[in-house]
Design a protein with these regions (language model features):
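Membrane-embedded alpha-helical bundles that constitute the cytochrome b-like, heme-associated redox core
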Residues: 1-186
Length: 186
């Protein structure tokens, strides 16, 4: 027999799959972005970075569409904690979509015209932006990387708090409100 109440407290399998696929891709992408050489010796890594970035953009748009068409489980926390969780989740969506878009803007405004070929197979167009925006696009892309890193740390810390609440409730024999951790797929 299916426990409908428990099922309503969990994210769907699709949401969980998108969450962890994007999380792993973001971790890889941030590590790659911070470690890539800034000269022509990193050409292959830049191509990989662009393909991973486009993939993150497409997956994030799919995740946003999923979120808009599938009801998430009820919020675990209220008050300031609930506000903070909602703010971090919203900003993570801005990051997951904004970061690839600013990267696309960097490539599109670069004085070095190198075509982008998605995973070496699909030509990817450049945005019709003036080259004068390149410096601002690069600075914004780098700033978003640091902001995204901070948001990820806040998100993981929030999950730690939620799991702690759930474990505390379980050890005391009480029920955690709304299932404190449904394996994070917000």
């Amino acid at each position: 027999m299916v426990d409908l109440e428990a099922a309503q407290r969990r994210y769907s399998g699709g949401a969980i799959l998108l969450h962890w696929t994007i999380a792993l891709a973001l971790g890889f992408q941030l590590a790659l972005g911070f470690s890539m050489p800034k000269d022509e010796s990193g050409f292959a890594l830049y191509q990989l970075h662009k393909s991973v970035g486009i993939t993150i953009l497409l997956l994030s748009l799919a995740r946003l569409a999923w979120r808009l068409t599938h009801r998430p489980p009820p919020a675990v926390e209220g008050g300031f904690q609930g506000f903070l969780a909602k703010a971090v989740h919203t900003l993570l969506y801005v990051f997951m979509i904004g970061m690839p878009l600013t990267g696309w803007a960097v490539v599109s405004t670069s004085p070095i015209e190198v075509p982008t070929v998605f995973w070496g197979a699909i030509p990817w167009p450049h945005l019709p932006l003036p080259g004068s925006l390149n410096g601002a696009a690069e600075e914004t892309h780098e700033l978003l990387a640091w902001i995204g890193l901070a948001l990820i740390v806040l998100h993981v810390a929030g999950v730690g708090v939620a799991v702690g609440v759930a474990l505390g409730a379980a050890s005391s024999g009480t029920r955690a409100r709304s299932g404190a951790c449904s394996w994070t797929a917000s």
